[in-house]
Every structure is written in structure tokens, then in C-alpha cells.
Regions:
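Short hydrophobic/aromatic-rich motifs at helix boundaries and adjacent loops
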Residues: 1-2, 151
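Non-heme Fe(II)/2-oxoglutarate
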Residues: 2-96
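Catalytic core of non-heme Fe(II) oxygenases with the double-stranded beta-helix
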Residues: 75-200
Length: 200
């Protein structure tokens, strides 16, 4: 896949786009997600977004999430408030018709700086794009290991390939078959990101 945006810095497995949205669109997203009536859901397992155990464990990855689209189907009335971003993705050759999952995630400040459990967002070949809504810390870690090489679970000690330090209005793009981890912000009060998964 070729990305043609002039602000896109390309490495072998990882790409980042600075200043992805204009200021007006940035403010629109912040106003949406920080509005007191926006429906965030609590999860005790922020990696998957679903926790059937409902027991708080010492290693629980607690956060908030909102799913806009899943398995290619719109599942939130707020999708209309965010779909304008798809025009910007098409400018870098990520096509809206290939979007299979769209989810916002929110982590609050936590002293634990360790990366969360390595995971992939989908089992099929896909490209993952993570957009940072606010200025925050809490690195995104991408590993060498892929779902193809470890189809059921990431190795216990995966090999770190790239570490992306988040910043407001930046976009991280990578092959979604690579295991990756989010992490809590330890300095800023919250980390707000939107994850897009595009089928390859």
C-alpha cells in the first residue's frame, strides 16, 4: 500500500502522519468525546473491549471505549459525527469501503507505565491506524511478531520493533497483523485515541 501524504514519514513497518486534521476538525472531535452526554462504556479489559468476567483483577486493563463500527456494520448513532475523518483517510489511500472496525478508547492517568497485553484487532489481514485526539503520553508499542507467526496468542516476551509517542493530531499507521500494545498515560490526565481497522 502506498501513502502519498507529504507529511507521512515512512519506515519499513511503520508510518506516522503529522497534523492529520485541520484545527476545526480537531476541535469537533474533542467537543464530541469530552461532552458529558457522550456514551462511554467501562471495560475491565480494554484490549478487547469486552469482559464477561466482570471481576476486577490486579492486572485488569481498565479503560473506557465506544465502538462506532464493528465487522463493517455501523453500531453507534455517533458514527455520523465522526465519518468526516474517512475523507482524510482516502487522501492517504485508506478506503472507507475497507473499514471493518472503528473504536474510540480512553485511558486515565496511571502510574503503571508498562505496555498493555500485546494483541491484534482482527485475525484477517488489515491495516491499523491510531489517531490521537488529545495531547498525551502513553506509548503505542509495535512488535516484530505477527498473528501469522503466532496465530492464537502473542509470545510471552515479544520483540519490540517500534515505539510511537502520541501527540495530539498525529496518526500512527502500521500492518495490523503485528502484535501491538497500548499503555496508560503516566504524566497527562487522559489518553484519548481512535482506532481504525481497514481490511487489506
Amino acid at each position: 500500500m502506498t501513502y502519498q501524504n507529504q507529511d507521512c514519514r515512512i519506515t519499513e513497518k511503520f508510518q506516522s502522519v503529522d497534523d492529520f486534521l485541520d484545527i476545526g476538525k480537531q476541535k469537533e472531535l474533542l467537543n464530541l468525546f469530552l461532552h458529558p452526554k457522550f456514551p462511554w462504556a467501562l471495560t475491565l479489559n480494554a484490549v478487547n473491549g469486552v469482559d464477561t468476567n466482570l471481576q476486577i483483577q490486579d492486572d485488569s486493563t481498565i479503560g473506557m471505549f465506544h465502538t462506532f463500527l464493528y465487522d463493517g456494520q455501523i453500531c453507534s448513532p455517533f458514527f455520523e459525527n465522526i465519518k468526516f475523518m474517512l475523507d482524510d483517510f482516502e487522501k492517504i489511500n485508506l478506503l472507507r469501503n475497507n473499514l471493518i472496525r472503528l473504536r474510540a478508547g480512553l485511558f486515565f492517568k496511571n502510574p503503571d507505565s508498562r505496555p498493555h497485553v500485546p494483541h491484534v484487532d482482527a485475525k484477517i489481514p488489515h491495516t491499523t491506524a491510531v489517531y490521537y485526539v488529545n495531547d498525551c503520553d502513553g506509548d503505542l508499542v509495535i512488535y516484530d511478531e505477527t498473528y501469522k507467526s503466532h496465530p492464537w496468542k502473542a509470545p510471552e516476551f515479544p520483540t519490540e520493533n517500534y515505539r510511537f509517542a502520541p501527540c495530539q493530531n498525529k496518526l500512527a499507521i502500521f500492518d495490523g497483523q503485528h502484535y501491538h500494545s497500548s499503555s496508560y498515560p503516566t504524566q497527562k490526565p487522559l489518553r484519548l485515541a481512535i482506532t481504525f481497522n481497514f481490511q487489506q
